[in-house]
Amino acid sequence: MKPDRDAAEEFFEYDAEEFLVFLTLLITEGRTPECSVKGRTEGVHCPPAQSAMPVLTKHECSDKIPQCRQARRTRSEVMLLWRNHIPIMIEVMLLPDCCYSDEGPTTDCTDLNDPAIKQDALLLERWTLQPVPRQSGDRFIEEKTLLLAVRSYVFFSQLSAWLSASHGIVPRNILYRISAADEELIWNFSQTPSEHAFPVPNVSHSVALKVRVQSLPRQPRYPVLKCSIHSGLAFLGKRALEHGEGGNQAGDNRSSLRLPRSPLFSRSLHPSPPSHSPLNTRKCPPRPESPLPPGKAVKWLYSRLNGGIDTPPSEPYSLCTNGAESPKTSRTESPIRGFKSLSITDPLVIPSPSSISGETNPLIGSLLQERQEVIARIAQRLNFCDPTAPHLPDALFTSQEPPGHKTTWNSTQDKECLKKSKDSLFSVPHPQNHNGNSLEIPERSRSSLFDTPLSPRTRTRLDRVDRESKTSPKPATCRRLVLSDQSAEGSLIADAVQDISRLIQERLQHSYSLLNGTYKLKTSQNEQVGSNHGAQTNGFVSLSSHKKPTNAPNGEESTDPHISHATKCCRSPDSSRRKPDCSPRPLKVASLKLEDHSVTKSQPLTASNHQHYVSRESWTSLKNNSSHASSPQENGLTQIGYHQPFKNRVAISEKEAEKHVRDGSTCLEKDENQEPHSSLSSTPANLTCNISSLAPTESNQTSCGNWKKQTRHSIDGTATKAFHPCTGLPLLSSPVPQRKSQTGYFDLDTSLIHCRGVPWAANRRVLKRSQDYDESQHQILSASAPPANLSLLGNFEECVLNYRLEPLGTVEGFTAEVGASGTFCPSHMTLPVDVSFYSVSDDNAPSPYMGVINLESLGKRGYRVPPSGTIQVTLFNPNKTVVKMFVVMYDLRDMPASHQTFLRQRTFSVPVKREFNGQSNKKTSLGQGRTLRYLVHLRFQSSKSGKIYLHRDIRLLFSRKSMEVDSGAAYELKSFTELPADPPFSPRC
């Protein structure tokens, strides 16, 4: 029987209290919702993942941030319970969206037994953290293992799945409650919970930590929670009306709306309006005429139809729930009870995921409202182009509730009261509509919607729809907002909605008419342009898509905004200023279709392109391939007919091209928004490459940028090439002298430059050969690189192990089993192996494989091994057959704490000479004839307490086949293990 480990020698990476705080924060902040594809993220107070890189910027807590204040409160509560040896219980619950704000319930303990929280909350998880006596024996786990297990459980929990499926939208109100585990349970699971027990690590020399969690079974869909207090809007509307008429009466009625004051902290992604109406919720100060009792907050819910976003409501149907505090408290400085704002960014308010009718999809209302807002925004932007168009009220940017939902206002008296209250609001003069009728809307609704904060997803959709509305020649259909006929302003808003539809259709039809005439210029105009500006264009005629139309008083200039660039060059600078443009954002054409579909796209005309060198060969090829020209070359101008095939209209002399490059005509100053296919490339080489039908020749120069964008996949993203293809110089270190003899490693063939598989072999610059060059004496030479036998730095072994050679490909399915033995035997680990192969010769000879075993998945420190003993690495191929078993003996007992070193074992096959005439020849020397067959590279590091770990990775070199030697030759395998000598160990970084 193995003796127990000495407790005094055991090293604990965390303090017991600190580890418990990390564990609690991982549970409470590990699923912080955010509006992203993942839908959630880890809070700033969560412990960093063990396998991740060190955090570059460490978070510093501030008392002004609610999350930091709540994290400090959580820390104090956990430490208080732990120091008194009391088990800790963490409960995770959901609350309905209708009556619980983003601040959550208060943190006092007076209303812990409030029946509302008992009925409304849905218990999801119950965690129990209990101290137990220290575990003994060799089968132990460390604190980081428990952290990894809890992080994995939190990542794959039901709550994380809901957040991921909704991209962080639902659930909105997540509550966490920390209490003593021996207290009476207040909440129970709606179904029989499933329980999971985690491994028990030792957190100190005398105490271990036992963690278990009970969770609600997996649900097929997100539950729609109903509020037990607010059953309908009629009740809420009556409460709001009573509150508007008398503050005392409203204060009495708020007793039933009061939320429990329990040690709960809540997270809410968005302010939560009632489930059937897209009402916006904002924190607003209480009204002066109705003072509130101390410690009580009010949440005002008001429609964006009658008010701006950041303006407190003044209409009676603002709904009173739990909400804001005194006006002195800003939005960012919410009380401590607002534990964590679930959204890193404050996105646009999204309606409730469910309706009174019981919608099952929580995202439908959000998508519909966002789409209607986008359409309304487009209409307002198009409205800027027409100074005679009526003003569009900002309230149109939120869709109104359908008439069918008005049935929830089941009281006739409530409706009459609401109408009376609304009539008192419309007293501010407002711009008139196109019929001359005055629209009287409250002044606060005049706030610009371009100042409204948008979520990244909404902003992306808005930009995409903006682009589509400017490019599509087909008039878009405007979604009509459903309005109530019973409201006082219903008819006025309906007229404004019709204006939206009219503006969109008129603007898009006008754009379509302009697009149709984009490239339909008359032949006479083209000839006039060519005769007047032939000296300036020098063989280049380009088209430019100008956005602003220019009209001359005499009518000579075309009103078409899409004119030839040559005409633009001769136009006076102030000609475009004769007619002011009322549009701050003119229509921009992003994609146009020409009548002639044979036009090939080329790069836009830019001034920077004229700095490139023009080779005579490429222009000679272009001139020879262009069979037809629209004008003689002696005129110095190439005219392009707009109704002829493109390949039959290009004829440019090389003299004109060189002159164009030297002079740089004024036509370089073109519109930056010009279409790529509406201009010829100013770079002759680019023009030759882009028009494949005209110039199928191949360029001799290769850009260095293309070399960086090759689609070669490295092992871990850190692989680099040995030499730069343009300079020929080594990238990582200086060249080494030429080897006079083979070293016995994976030596390279001298004709490596011919290998088609090497990524940089095809990108070498070669000397041009003359016309009478003899093919028999052909030898590819480098312009600046060292000889071919120096193409790799050192040898193949060093280049591959240090990622200096790019692999040709990877092989999936290899695995390895890593184990160790010595004073103790750690558990064997089976890990995947990233295997890649290379090409090292021109005869397609098989190259060895390189395998990388990543140990970072085992934790930051790696795989713990005894100070001395044996390490065994068994490599399996995809067929689960053993390829090689590496057995390495080591002794690192002299290694100091917080140091590192490495170990490399090589296995060679050394042939043995046969006996001739009864005489036995000696074996060949170690440097002659030996071939490297296998290699294993191990990295070791020691912790602060002197424990030895295999860390980072294990790198292997092994043969493609089992043994690549002559079957008739005598050989033997020899292994050599090497360690650094001076110094043998180095301090850890």
Curated annotation (Swiss-Prot):
Supply the InterPro entries for this chain.
Atos-like_C, Atos-like_cons_dom, ATOS_Transcription_Regulators
Q: Ranges of Low complexity compositional bias?
A: 254-270
Give the span(s) annotated as Required for macropage invasion.
792-849
Query: Where in the sequence does UniProt note compositional bias of the Basic and acidic residues kind?
Result: 413-423, 460-471, 656-675
Task: State if Nucleus is listed as a keyword.
Answer: yes
Cited Pfam families: Chromosome_seg (PF13889), DUF4210 (PF13915)
The record's region (Disordered) falls at 244-295, 393-477, 525-639, 656-686
Q: Which UniProt keywords apply?
A: Nucleus
Quick one: where's region Transactivation domain 2 (TAD2)? 876-884
Question: Region labeled Transactivation domain 1 (TAD1) — which residues?
Answer: 24-32
Its main subcellular localisation, reduced to a broad class, is nucleus
Origin: domain of life: Eukaryota
Bias regions of kind Polar residues — which residues? 397-412, 525-544, 600-638, 676-686
Q: Where in the cell is it found?
A: Nucleus
Would you name any one GO CC term?
nucleus
Q: What is the recorded function of this protein according to its Swiss-Prot or TrEMBL entry?
A: Transcription regulator that syncronizes transcriptional and translational programs to promote macrophage invasion of tissues.
Read off the domain note.
The protein contains 2 transactivation domains (TAD). Each of these domains may be required for transcriptional activation of a subset of target genes.
* Family indicated by similarity: Belongs to the ATOS family.
Record's protein name = Atos homolog protein A
Q: Which gene encodes it?
A: atosa
